[in-house]
């Protein structure tokens, strides 16, 4: 089974204006949507499109949390959220008016007792289950939370996927995550230098493998992606052609595609192809990748 963790889910209230935003004035919306999200939830959504079942874990609170939970169930996603006694699941306001303005909610405070509940859930995972940790850590939790969770899973045979940046990523490497997915700029920040060539990116990825990562997947936006797998093989792929209209969730979609591709084929090359198709499908769409768009782009890769 695949499990995703979203520490701070959100309801994104997206407002579209047909003219520039006027601060301090009444602005009339030309359109609006509510999108249920968070990085782990995004991964679960794309996995569903690919026919892979997953369970979305994390924390919800208040009426907004109940609304988010019902909405995800209506989309066909399995969830097993921990319900917090205080606070509310956050609402992010995103105003699209030529440029995009965001007002992101803080989300509820997560007490130690809730973290212990999450650890109890993870303690039931079986060998070869996949656990996907993605995104930042809420302020109410320690920045060592990822390390804490992976340390608790040592010896369980669980395959961990971590999509995070800087210290959050570096500090989990001793726990030998199955997959990490920095982009080329994030990888450069980790190794302390700008990475301009495939050879430089490959060398930096191998350096993270030496610290413990099994597979290193590096996304490079319009330049495609590069994978250094656990056998030392380097796989390079370009991007299909298309107009980028959305950056939200593209990385999450790539993670979902890679995991699904590997589980379905056992091939890292196929995993990279499907991951790239999924990331591109989201980038070329107003929402997350659909199975139809993914299938279309797979023909081009």
Please state what every model-predicted region is:
Residues 144-231:
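Conserved phosphate/ATP/ADP-binding segment of small-molecule kinases
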Residues 23-25, 49-129, 298-301:
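Conserved N-terminal subdomain of the carbohydrate kinase-like
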Residues 2, 52-54, 79-80, 160, ...:
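Hydrophobic anchor at the start of a short beta-strand
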Residues 1-57, 65-67:
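Glycine-rich phosphate/adenosyl-contacting loop at the front of the ribokinase-like
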Residues 102-104, 129-135, 163, 181-186:
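Short beta-strands and strand-loop turn motifs
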Residues 48, 154, 263:
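Gly/Ala-rich phosphate-binding loop of Rossmann-like dinucleotide-binding domains
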Residues 170, 198-301:
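Conserved phosphate-binding/catalytic region of the ribokinase-like
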Residues 108-111, 137-141, 168-170, 189, ...:
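Short, small-residue-enriched loops and turns at beta-alpha junctions
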């Amino acid at each position: 089974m695949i499990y995703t963790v979203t520490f701070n889910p959100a309801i994104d209230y997206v407002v579209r204006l047909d003219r520039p935003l006027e601060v301090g004035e009444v602005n009339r919306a030309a359109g609006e949507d509510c999108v249920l999200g968070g990085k782990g939830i995004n991964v679960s959504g794309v996995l569903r499109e690919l026919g892979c079942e997953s369970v979305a874990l994390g924390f919800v609170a208040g009426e907004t949390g109940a609304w988010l939970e019902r909405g995800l169930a209506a989309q066909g996603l399995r969830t097993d959220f921990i319900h917090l006694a205080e606070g509310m699941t956050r609402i992010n306001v995103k105003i699209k008016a030529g440029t995009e303005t965001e007002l992101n909610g803080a989300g509820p405070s997560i007490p130690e007792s809730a973290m212990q509940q999450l650890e109890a859930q993870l303690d039931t995972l079986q060998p070869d289950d996949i656990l996907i940790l993605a995104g930042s850590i809420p302020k109410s939790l320690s920045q060592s939370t990822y390390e804490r969770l992976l340390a608790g899973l040592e010896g369980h045979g669980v395959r961990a996927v971590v999509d995070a940046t800087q210290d959050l990523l570096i500090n989990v490497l001793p726990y030998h995550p199955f997959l990490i997915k920095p982009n080329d700029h994030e990888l450069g920040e980790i190794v302390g230098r700008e990475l301009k060539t495939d050879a430089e990116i490959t060398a930096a990825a191998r350096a993270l493998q030496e610290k413990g990562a099994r597979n290193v997947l590096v996304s490079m936006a319009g330049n495609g992606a590069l994978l250094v797998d656990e056998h030392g093989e380097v796989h390079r792929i370009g991007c299909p052609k298309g107009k980028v209209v959305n950056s939200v969730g593209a990385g999450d979609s790539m993670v979902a595609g890679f995991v699904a591709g590997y589980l379905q084929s056992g091939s890292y090359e196929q995993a990279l192809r499907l991951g790239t198709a999924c990331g591109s499908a989201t980038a070329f769409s107003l929402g997350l990748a659909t199975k139809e768009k993914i299938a279309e782009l797979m023909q081009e890769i």
